[in-house]
Amino acid sequence: MENHFKSQLIQYYEYLQKNTATNSMVEQAIGIKQINLTRYKATLEEEGNLVVVRKGFCEVTGFPADYLSTNKEIIKKVNERKYKETLFP
């Protein structure tokens, strides 16, 4: 991965460690274009390092969006919730 994009991926990851946000909110906060954030989201999800915490209306766009996190404690809780939902649908 090119250094510039790797640096952006790290910034994205670190921002979502401390904030639960949509990609539009992240773009506004740290200035990385949403098209790149979408790519980083897919990469981190595949690695198990990012989860959708909830669906809601974005504070920036007002449209339905996923609220995201890379916080390990939040990831653990979301994964536990998903597991319970598979046991008791």
Model-assigned labels for residue ranges:
Residues Q17-M25:
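Short capping segments at the starts of secondary-structure elements
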Residues M1-Y15:
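Short alpha-helical segments that sit at the start of domains
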Residues M25-G31:
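A short acidic, leucine-rich amphipathic alpha-helix
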